[in-house]
Amino acid sequence: EAVKLMRGKPKSAINLTLSRKSEPLPIVVTIVRDVIRVQSVRSKWLEQGYAYIRITQFQEHTVASTVSHLNKLLQQAEADTAKPVKGIVLDLRNDPGGLLHAAVGVSATFLRDNVTVVSTDGRQPDAKRSFAAKPSDYLRGGSDPLTGLNPKAKTLPMVVLVNGGSASASEIVAGALQDHKRAVVLGTQTFGKGSVQTILPLTSSTAIKLTTARYYTPAGRSIQAKGIRPDFWVEESE
């Protein structure tokens, strides 16, 4: 309720009244609303020639950002022949998920064209769907960000890092890369958020959210309440 009241047009002002135990009277603070932009992809070089890509959430521009970061790192490696790239590390630890088409697009970045990424199944006929590594399944308008992808992204050795905080879209990507033997999954068991939820309007101001289907990896494994088991179990050091 509080968040709903604070939302508004960018650059508009809002007064917040705060109550603190240490202050006898409420404090009024004026803040200016703005669009919050979260960078969902980061990258860097790890020691000994490994390109590291960290995805914190699957958002609208995550696929394009992933391609951009990959191309930049691989271009740097091609320019310095003394330090060839040996592999790719995709870090999905503590990534809670996000948009389904973004997960399909990120998977397509590393997989062969047209292979299955994820499928859904439920009681209703329209719940049975399959999503593949092709533009029609990950694009939501605009140009295809994978058009300019460095082809080495699909062939270099690859490791995916996961843990108990990797959920939903993260599990879709990890499961697809694991089933197609494109990458080795390393870490601990993922969260197990593999349900498809549909919002059904009841009145003008209310709705009900129901679980209508489940996600399945290309090999037919259910993600729900099971998660993705890594190929190599490695606990994180504190």
Predicted segments, located by residue:
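Long, folded non-catalytic interaction modules
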Residues: A102-A103, T211, Y216
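Short acidic, Pro/Gly- and aromatic-enriched capping/linker segments at domain boundaries
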Residues: L202-A213
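Cleft-lining beta-strand/loop regions that shape enzyme active-site pockets
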Residues: E1-T203
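Conserved functional hotspot residues or short segments at active or partner-binding sites
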Residues: R214, P218-E238
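Beta-strand scaffold of nucleotide-dependent catalytic cores
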Residues: V29, L210-T211, G220
